[in-house]
Every structure is written in structure tokens, then in C-alpha cells.
């Protein structure tokens, strides 16, 4: 394996600790920073403003019973496309931390949400669900995730799958392998498309499959994600999706369907 630039230059040592039995809650939405800030022990405004998407830190909060929580690992991010925080909590405090947030915010500002709500949000945000939109046979290039492959990796290679992936990054017109299929978003007319539905061209020929789909509460339209034959992947392309034996009109659409609102140092629009 070819060493990366970081390895060549002697990167710093990394230590980690496995947090066994911890729970996780995701505080998501435009009021999440305000709600978390109200219960933090330390002054929250400056700390949270400097905590950008993808960063994390340990914080303590004031619990309902007047006690102070153990250090909680708070990461700014989530699986909804909204600003928010994923909070890792020791098992013994998972319930009281959740109740503290709920009661402090009140039902008009914060409510519990299940997997159905999370799934529709992540699909609106164009996020993949492993085992559905991704599996161990999918490459980052096919999945429209080439941005995860850093410049250093592209130059040195040597990572698992690099021979195939680096070849796919170069289009066929420039001597590369390109890809045969690409992950795309779709707006579907009529009934919502579900996983496994076939995507066909105007001749009725199969050109792809749906991997996720649902009605979008935000848009009031049916959104879907899937893989389509290279060449049909451009935004605005008209196709059809076979739903319960009937062909429904669909249009290839850029993702995210709903603009993401991650905190990057400026107020989300």
C-alpha cells in the first residue's frame, strides 16, 4: 500500500475510548442551538456559534432535578439536512437528559420524532441509507460521493478499491473507465415510488431502480432516489417509474431536494 502524505510526514498519534452502552439522541431543527443553549452549564452562545457542522465537544447540562449531567459528547450534525446536534449520553442519564430538553423547550418547540420522520428528512436532504442506497458493491463515484475522496488519496492511491475508483473518476472520453450507473434524485408524479421500483425510458426499457422513495412533507411532492444508466442522469431528464404495474412520469432532479441548513458560521437561510 502506498503511504499517504500524512503518513509520510509522521502524523500525530490518535487515542480513542470506546463508550460502551451509551445512548444517542438527535436534536434537530432551526431551534436546536437555542434549546441546547438554554440548559448548558457553561455560557452557550459563544460556544455554539464556534461549533461548526462536523465538530464535537463534551458539554454538561442542567438536569430537571437540579443536578448537573455527566459530560455529554455533542456533535454538530445529523441525518436530516437541518442544523442540529447528535448527543451521546451515558445509559443511566439518557431518559433524564431527553426529558430535560423536552420540558425546557415545551411541545410547541420540541417533540419526539420516529424513524419515519427521520427517513423522510434524510431523503429530502439527499442522504443515503446504507443497505438501500449504498452497499459494499457501490463505489463513491457511482453514488455521487466523489467529494469524500481527498486530493491526497487521488494522487497516491493505495486505499481499498483505489484501482477501480480512480479509474471511474476519469471519464471514458479521457481514457478512464467512467461508470455504468449513477445515483440520482427523482420527482415522481402520482403515487410515491418505493424501493425496488423500476426506472424505464420512453421505450419501456429498464434503465435503473429506485432505492428509496416517499412523499415529501416539505415539498408536497413524491421524491425518490435511485440508480440510473449513465447518460440518463442529467437533471431535467424525463423518465418513467413502474409503480404497481403502472408507469408514472418522473423527472431527474438535483439533490438535495430541500436545501441543507448546516451551521457553517453564518445563519442558515
How would you name each of these model-derived features?
Residues 1-269:
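Conserved, structured C-terminal
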Amino acid at each position: 500500500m502506498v503511504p499517504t502524505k500524512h503518513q509520510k510526514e509522521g502524523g500525530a498519534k490518535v487515542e480513542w475510548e470506546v463508550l460502551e452502552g451509551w445512548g444517542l439522541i438527535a436534536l434537530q431543527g432551526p431551534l436546536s442551538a437555542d434549546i441546547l443553549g438554554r440548559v448548558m452549564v457553561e455560557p452557550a452562545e459563544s460556544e455554539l456559534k464556534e461549533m461548526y457542522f462536523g465538530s464535537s465537544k463534551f458539554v454538561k447540562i442542567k438536569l430537571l432535578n437540579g443536578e448537573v449531567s455527566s459530560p455529554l459528547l455533542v456533535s454538530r450534525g445529523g441525518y436530516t439536512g437541518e442544523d442540529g446536534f447528535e448527543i451521546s449520553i451515558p445509559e443511566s442519564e439518557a431518559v433524564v437528559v431527553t426529558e430535560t430538553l423536552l420540558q425546557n423547550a415545551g411541545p410547541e418547540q420540541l417533540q419526539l420524532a420516529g424513524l419515519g420522520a427521520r427517513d423522510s428528512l434524510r431523503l429530502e436532504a439527499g442522504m443515503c441509507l446504507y443497505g438501500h442506497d449504498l452497499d459494499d458493491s457501490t463505489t463513491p463515484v457511482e453514488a455521487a460521493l466523489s467529494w469524500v475522496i481527498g486530493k491526497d488519496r487521488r494522487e497516491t492511491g493505495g486505499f481499498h478499491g483505489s484501482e477501480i475508483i480512480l479509474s471511474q473518476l476519469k471519464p471514458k472520453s479521457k481514457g478512464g473507465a467512467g461508470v455504468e450507473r449513477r445515483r440520482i434524485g427523482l420527482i415522481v408524479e402520482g403515487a410515491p415510488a418505493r424501493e425496488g421500483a423500476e426506472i424505464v425510458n420512453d421505450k419501456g426499457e429498464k434503465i435503473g431502480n429506485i432505492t428509496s422513495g416517499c412523499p415529501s412533507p416539505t415539498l408536497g411532492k413524491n421524491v425518490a432516489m435511485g440508480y440510473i444508466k449513465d447518460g440518463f442522469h442529467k437533471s431535467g431528464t424525463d423518465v418513467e417509474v413502474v409503480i404497481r404495474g403502472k408507469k408514472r412520469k418522473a423527472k431527474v432532479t438535483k439533490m438535495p431536494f430541500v436545501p441543507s441548513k448546516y451551521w457553517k458560521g453564518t445563519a442558515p437561510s
